[in-house]
Amino acid sequence: MKFDVIIIGAGSAGMQVATALQKAGRKTAVIGLGRSINEVEVRPYERKGGTLLIGDSVCEGLFEDGRLKAVRTANLGAYPLEAERFVLATGKFLGGGLVADMERVYEPLFGLDVAWDKDRSRWFDADFGAPQPFLRFGLETDAQSRPSLSGRTVENLYACGEILAGVSAVDGREAIAASAAKVLSILTEEGHAEA
């Protein structure tokens, strides 16, 4: 199955991008586990015919020449979902966008490069009410909101929302919305959407 844009993550940032692209006439799909679904944004998207794969998860990315060509999901198995562009909006730790173990912090879907402090003792502040440093971990992107894989930019993958380094819902929703708006603007400027 081929789409113009596949959005991975059905939270606020992912649904903001999906809804705007759908209104612009783009064929989109949203894949989300359902951990942080924004029901207010999902319902109109679904009513207008958006492809919504809730309860499914990406289990493999198929890369070729620095581009993500398709993804395989747990529920669709051998049937890849292809797109010209992909948007990653999976959140941080609670949404499953980042995972931490005793040695590292990593992005579990594609193994994208993550900005994090290697000194585990600096991951937190003992004052529970203080800003927690681990909430600043995430993907660093280029000026076009594209993350990197092993130091190389993935040309057609864009990241927005809490998955980004320095963005946290603790600070308010403005930064999340702004990152989604930036990705939408970039897709629009490239001629991949009309907003």
Task: Give the role of each language-model region.
Residues 1-195:
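Residues forming the flavin
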